[in-house]
């Protein structure tokens, strides 16, 4: 099915949830909510506050697509974010005194206690957390009392308060207890957590006043999808009741419904119901939104419940179509011109993802009878699905949408559509078409490294070398994928910033409650929870303090925090961003498998950030995130007769099997690193299918940019850029690997079975 998958069936890297947004500009905030950032080991997870705006929040306030719940270990892939490094002057290594972190030490959470290990109380903490997730109030109450001296005692205390408040939301005593808790922990992340979950309880109880009071005080979580939907619902209810600002409230609600990545969330379902109650005539636009969001069951339910007068099509005919669109088309294919235009619009939207060619035939038939806006909406969707299927007709379909491509009323995914229009143009090899597509991008996307680079390439190919060089130069100081390619386009060396890492001020961070609570969570393998505390400590720090905290993370072997914390600065400290833990083991395994160690380092950095015990929700394990089934297959191939799944978290075993599998994948794709890297992430059969879709030999950079899975696209770009950095930064003979060389050219080859798991 041609869709941009967020879940990859073979071996997702810590549960892959992709963001349907393109790369942001060099130091714009990554497109992550704080919840997403917390749930992420590998992606840049913090907005960079400029040093002069010390209080900049982590979230940029935008409603995000596919927001992630704050519970559970998940992996989120944001856009590739490039860095404009600060000019570097050689400095002497010295201990840096960080600025005061925005945390409040409390008597209940002595920082040093975080490093104290007590297996019995740790086990009780985990069990209490599980009880909280199951809403077992009695077990949580008991756990909270017993864990009063645990380093993370404030969490069971909060869980207990939340369960009691959920049970009796109007109980004044429970409300006062929660208010007191929040006041006592003012300035700590736990207060943000308490306000967020209390706001959700208030929304569930339709307590608008309480919700707004809590929502206004949130620093991080205002952009969570359910809270955004609840706020829009309460604002709409006020407008309906007071008869004031109703058009504005309806417009805001429509925008939220259009942009939310969680239309199934209960809060967003309630908003949709409130919106339709306030404006029954909006039923048809909302129906079309649901069709584009592929919420076909919800669309069918809406059609069933809506007054027939609000739909421009017979509801029985609509039900027949939605129940079995393929059967419907076979019955009506020869008389499409006699079917109502609205019904054909729905038919094309319904079939676009599963049968794009048939959808295009229907769109062609009905186009003359549609308004310009509806015609644009339809062809935008057909073009998008064709582009995601790597169909060579995609660019022509997009062109049929006209000037309103991606922007017609009720069109879902404007930025996504416009970005894929540009990617479809890349696959045509028509550089004038590429330039035209890039020029249609919104300013923020146009300023991203990716589209600065491709615009420069287009200008270069169409006879404007001076303008092209100016654009290349504007990103050539960046250290990510397109910054490296821009350097090559200019014939200049890659950036080589040798700023030394600071000596960590351990005594300072040892007393920082948020940092120490994070360490306690990491000890319990509760990485998402630990990341929230870590990021909270980090959120207002300036560059030097962030680098010092990164050094502290490295000294604790928290390489995922060392990398991410250092990346949340404009100062490029290569030893922090590209560490080499387990050097002997990694290099031995790579060399035994006849792989370049730099590639293995680059892959592990993206897979697990060198977390030895990393485990995905579907079972991928260890630094190289190997699935047990794959591991058993490779072990049999290597005649490792004594292998067991439990060995996958053993560093040596994981590296041996992971490297051998990577070598087998590379050999299956004739040594092509883009194809092999994509295959390691998304599966060999998918990589082979993407290659088969090519109509001519394509440069590796174009192939990588047009991979239809957001996660895999970013993965390939990051892994290969990582490979260049590891090869360049640590290579004593300065024999620099060129990114363009390892990207190479990808040649089409008929689809074939790849005998690999």
Where in the sequence are the language-model features?
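Gram-negative bacterial Sec-dependent N-terminal signal peptides
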Residues: 2-27
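Residue-level signature for tetratricopeptide repeat
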Residues: 130, 159, 163, 201, ...
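Generic helix N-cap/helix-start motif at coil->alpha-helix transitions
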Residues: 116-124, 136, 149-157, 172-174, ...
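Catalytic glycan-binding domains that act on GlcNAc-containing polysaccharides
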Residues: 150, 158, 361, 365-375, ...
């Amino acid at each position: 099915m041609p869709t941009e998958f967020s879940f990859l069936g073979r071996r997702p890297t810590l549960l892959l949830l992709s963001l349907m947004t393109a790369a942001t500009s060099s130091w714009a905030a990554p497109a992550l909510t704080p919840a997403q950032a917390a749930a992420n080991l590998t992606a840049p997870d913090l907005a960079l506050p400029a040093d002069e705006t010390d209080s900049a929040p982590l979230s940029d306030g935008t409603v995000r697509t596919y927001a992630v719940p704050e519970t559970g270990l998940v992996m989120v892939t944001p856009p590739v974010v490039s860095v404009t490094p600060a000019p570097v002057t050689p400095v002497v290594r010295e201990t840096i005194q960080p600025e005061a972190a925005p945390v409040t030490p409390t008597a209940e959470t002595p920082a040093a206690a975080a490093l104290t290990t007590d297996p019995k109380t740790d086990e009780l903490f985990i069990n209490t957390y599980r009880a909280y997730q199951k809403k077992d109030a009695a077990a949580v109450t008991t756990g909270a009392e017993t864990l009063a001296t645990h380093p993370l005692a404030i969490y069971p205390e909060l869980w207990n308060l939340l369960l009691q408040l959920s049970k009796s939301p109007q109980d004044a005593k429970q409300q006062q207890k929660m208010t007191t808790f929040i006041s006592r922990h003012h300035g700590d992340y736990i207060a943000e957590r308490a306000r967020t979950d209390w706001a959700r309880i208030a929304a569930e109880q339709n307590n608008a006043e309480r919700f707004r009071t809590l929502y206004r005080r949130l620093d991080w979580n205002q952009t969570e999808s359910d809270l955004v939907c609840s706020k829009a619902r309460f604002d709409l209810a006020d407008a309906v009741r007071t008869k004031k600002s109703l058009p504005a409230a309806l417009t805001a609600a429509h925008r939220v419904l259009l942009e939310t990545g969680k239309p199934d969330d209960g809060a967003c379902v309630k908003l949709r119901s409130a919106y339709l109650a306030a404006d029954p005539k909006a039923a048809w636009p909302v129906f079309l939104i649901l069709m584009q969001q592929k919420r076909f069951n919800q669309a069918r339910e809406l059609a069933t419940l809506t007054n027939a007068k609000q739909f421009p099509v017979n509801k029985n005919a609509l039900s027949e179509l939605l129940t079995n669109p393929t059967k419907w088309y076979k019955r009506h294919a020869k008389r499409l011109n006699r079917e109502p235009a609205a019904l054909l619009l729905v038919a094309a939207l319904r079939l676009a993802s599963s049968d794009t060619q048939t959808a295009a035939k229907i769109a062609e038939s009905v186009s003359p009878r549609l308004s310009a806006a509806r015609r644009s909406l339809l062809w935008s969707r057909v073009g998008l699905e064709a582009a995601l299927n790597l169909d060579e007709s995609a660019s022509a379909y997009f062109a049929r949408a006209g000037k309103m491509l991606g922007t017609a009323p009720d069109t879902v995914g404007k930025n996504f559509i416009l970005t894929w229009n540009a990617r479809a143009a890349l696959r045509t090899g028509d550089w004038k078409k590429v330039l035209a597509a890039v020029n249609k991008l919104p300013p923020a996307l146009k300023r991203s490294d990716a589209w600065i680079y491709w615009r420069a390439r287009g200008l270069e190919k169409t006879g404007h070398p001076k303008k092209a060089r100016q654009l290349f130069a504007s990103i050539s100081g960046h250290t990510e994928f397109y910054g490296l390619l821009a350097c090559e386009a200019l014939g200049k060396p890659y950036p080589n910033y040798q700023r030394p890492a600071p000596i960590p001020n351990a005594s300072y961070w040892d007393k920082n409650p948020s940092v120490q609570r994070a360490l306690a969570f990491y000890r319990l393998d509760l990485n998402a929870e630990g990341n929230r505390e870590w990021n909270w400590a980090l959120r207002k720090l300036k560059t030097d303090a962030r680098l010092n905290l990164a050094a502290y993370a490295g000294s604790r072997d928290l390489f995922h925090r060392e990398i991410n914390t250092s990346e949340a600065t404009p100062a490029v400290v290569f030893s922090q961003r590209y560490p080499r833990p387990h050097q002997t083991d990694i290099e031995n395994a790579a060399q035994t498998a006849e792989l370049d160690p730099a590639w293995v380092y680059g892959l592990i950095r993206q897979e697990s950030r060198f977390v030895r015990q990393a485990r995905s929700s579907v079972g991928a394990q260890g630094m190289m995130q190997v699935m047990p089934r794959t591991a058993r297959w490779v072990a049999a191939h290597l005649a490792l007769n004594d292998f067991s799944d439990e060995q996958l978290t053993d560093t040596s075993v994981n590296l041996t099997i992971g490297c051998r599998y990577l070598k087998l994948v590379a050999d299956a794709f004739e040594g092509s690193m883009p194809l092999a890297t994509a295959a390691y992430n998304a599966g060999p059969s998918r990589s082979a299918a993407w290659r088969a879709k090519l109509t001519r030999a394509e440069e590796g950079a174009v192939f990588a940019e047009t991979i239809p899975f957001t996660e895999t696209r970013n993965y390939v770009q990051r892994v290969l850029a990582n490979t260049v950095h590891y090869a360049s930064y640590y290579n004593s003979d300065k024999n620099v690997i060129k990114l363009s060389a390892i990207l190479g050219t990808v040649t089409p080859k008929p689809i074939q079975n790849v005998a690999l798991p």
